[in-house]
Amino acid sequence: FRAGMGDTIAKYFECHFSARGDELDYHSALGREISNLCYERIRTYAGKALAEFGEGKAGEAFTQAVLAITVNTGLVSHMVEDCYNCALAHAVCYGLDLIPGVAERFLHGDLVGYGILIQLAVDGQSGTLAKVRKLLKSMEIPVTLKEMGVALDKEFLRDMLKESVSGPDMEHIPYPVT
């Protein structure tokens, strides 16, 4: 559930990032607008939704989060052109998967959540990065490589970084990232 919320937040940031500067057809424009609800619902309800989940309750906050995870992301994924579905956050996730033990210890949405922070840093959105970092931390999604048990060693991270910048999710972004 927690990791699903991390992946849902990414839908908003990646859709807006990858669509930046493009003239969108109707369906992609509508999908991008729906992606706003992916982030807004999780930002608004995450804390209470996690509490309800922990108590085994299906209250309003839990329901709103589940709808964002399933309905909103599904609508966005099916409405926008494929090139607007993923960007740097997912590319970072797939790079992290190459590091031994990471995929076994963390869920996809955990890694994508961390990837959002990298995307925001690369894009120079420090104010938004701070807010998202705080949100992810409150959801117990890792916000540093250290929290994932990954050494900050350039040689060790080389394959991860290479995969992150050369993967298919990086083919349609507003500027080159190397």
Regions from the PLM with identified roles:
Residues 125-178:
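C-terminal charged capping/lid subdomain of soluble metabolic enzymes
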Residues 1-34:
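A glycine/threonine-rich phosphate-anchoring loop and its flanking beta-alpha core
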Residues 24-134:
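Active-site segments that bind and position negatively charged phosphate/pyrophosphate groups
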Residues 12-20, 49, 72, 99, ...:
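A short secondary-structure junction motif
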Residues 7-14, 67, 94, 117-118, ...:
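Generic alpha-helical structural context detector
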